[in-house]
């Protein structure tokens, strides 16, 4: 997707070795850098779908803040490529809480908007939960015809179904497991 978006020969990757939490994945699960789009420089960031389908993992919010800070300092647009499976649930406590955590990028988007710096999102694929929120906070949204976003309800649960779509049997099974755990 970067090859289609960025003018040839202008991509300059950033933070490719940045892994402050020393994740077993060896990454913060985002790809970011500077590049020209139609002749204009932009800061570009996207979820790395080769790792956990682009899920939020520890260290990712800090990397995102580095990128949003760069867009603010350079006064150039921030462009997102959004295809995110949500969060790596077993480690969510490591990146949800705190002043520089996963909620901060959304605040930063608002700051950029206030400063007149465009925040754009190219949305593709299935984006439940955290991926969905990431896709709705930018100023301008451009979605692929097959893209979807789910920030709550059945869309989240059906997004977890390997069969795709709304899965009534899967929902009933999840409800039964939840009740069983609650009764223990």
Language-model segments: residues:
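A generic structural signal for short coil/turn motifs at secondary-structure boundaries
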Residues: 52-56, 89-90
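A generic fold-level signal
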Residues: 25-27, 37, 73, 114, ...
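Conserved catalytic cores of soluble enzyme domains
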Residues: 82-184
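Short alpha-helix boundary/capping segments
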Residues: 55-63
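Intrinsically disordered, low-complexity segments enriched in small/flexible residues
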Residues: 1-42, 48-53
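A structural preference for short, pocket-lining loop segments at secondary-structure junctions
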Residues: 31-48, 62-91
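A generic alpha-helix structural signal
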Residues: 2-6, 61, 68, 109
């Amino acid at each position: 997707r970067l090859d289609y978006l960025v003018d040839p020969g202008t991509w300059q990757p950033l933070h490719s070795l940045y892994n402050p939490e020393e994740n077993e994945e060896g990454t913060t699960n985002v790809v970011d850098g500077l590049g020209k789009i139609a002749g204009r420089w932009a800061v570009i960031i996207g979820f790395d779908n080769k790792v956990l389908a682009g899920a939020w993992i520890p260290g990712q919010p800090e990397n995102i803040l580095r990128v949003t800070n760069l867009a603010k300092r350079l006064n150039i647009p921030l462009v997102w490529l959004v295809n995110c499976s949500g969060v790596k649930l077993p480690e969510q406590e490591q990146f949800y809480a705190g002043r520089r955590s996963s909620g901060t990028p959304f605040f930063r988007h608002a700051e950029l908007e206030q400063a007149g710096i465009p925040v754009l999102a190219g949305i593709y694929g299935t984006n439940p939960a955290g991926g969905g929120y990431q896709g709705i906070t930018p100023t301008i949204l451009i979605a692929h015809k097959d893209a979807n976003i789910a920030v709550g309800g059945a869309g989240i649960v059906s997004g977890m179904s390997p069969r795709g779509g709304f899965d009534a049997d899967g929902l009933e099974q999840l409800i039964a497991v939840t009740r069983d755990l609650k009764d223990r």
